[in-house]
């Protein structure tokens, strides 16, 4: 326990917050190249095949990034834009790939929350796009 005089001289040391996306180096997004595109299974109560890519960023760090939305066109050597944001049920996945930029296509047939998935606005009067696999 410090004395009042010690606190006057030195003060309390405040801890700096730890970054939740350290590989981005305080940038909002980073460009990278897909090293491996694969599927993985989520943690315990959930069950699915989640699409994930191992990405080498321009600062030469490698991260696991989640590919959001239904269906994607990514493969090895695709250039992608990576943003922060973890996936709660995938351990070690702390980043998201931005859809609709660089080599990543937007989600086809998406009508709601389109900006999050890089989907263009459908033409007025046009029938909704057919669903993919059932």
Swiss-Prot record:
HAMAP family: Ribosomal_uS12_B. Residues 1-27, 103-134 are annotated as: Disordered. GO terms for molecular function: rRNA binding; structural constituent of ribosome; tRNA binding. This is Small ribosomal subunit protein uS12. Residues 124-134 have a biased composition (Low complexity). InterPro entries: NA-bd_OB-fold, Ribosomal_uS12, Ribosomal_uS12_bac. GO terms for biological process: translation. PROSITE patterns: RIBOSOMAL_S12. Belongs to the universal ribosomal protein uS12 family. The gene is rpsL. Pfam families: Ribosom_S12_S23 (PF00164). Residues 111-123 have a biased composition (Basic residues). Part of the 30S ribosomal subunit. Contacts proteins S8 and S17. May interact with IF1 in the 30S initiation complex. It comes from Porphyromonas gingivalis (strain ATCC 33277 / DSM 20709 / CIP 103683 / JCM 12257 / NCTC 11834 / 2561). Gene3D superfamilies: Nucleic acid-binding proteins. The lineage of its organism: Bacteria, Pseudomonadati, Bacteroidota, Bacteroidia, Bacteroidales. With S4 and S5 plays an important role in translational accuracy. One of its GO terms (cellular component) is small ribosomal subunit. It comes from the Bacteria. Keywords: Methylation, Ribonucleoprotein, Ribosomal protein, RNA-binding, rRNA-binding, tRNA-binding.
């Amino acid at each position: 326990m410090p004395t009042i005089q010690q606190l006057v001289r030195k003060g309390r040391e405040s801890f700096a917050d730890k970054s939740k996306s350290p590989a981005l180096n305080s940038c909002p997004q980073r460009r990278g190249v897909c090293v491996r595109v694969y599927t993985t299974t989520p943690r315990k109560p959930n069950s699915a095949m989640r699409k994930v890519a191992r990405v080498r960023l321009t600062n030469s760090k490698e991260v696991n990034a989640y590919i959001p939305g239904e269906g994607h066109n990514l493969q090895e050597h695709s250039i992608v834009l990576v943003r922060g944001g973890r996936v709660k049920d995938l351990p070690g996945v702390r980043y998201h790939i931005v859809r609709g930029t660089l080599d990543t296509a937007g989600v086809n047939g998406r009508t709601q929350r389109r900006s999050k998935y890089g989907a263009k606005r459908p033409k007025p009067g046009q029938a909704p796009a057919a669903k993919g696999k059932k």
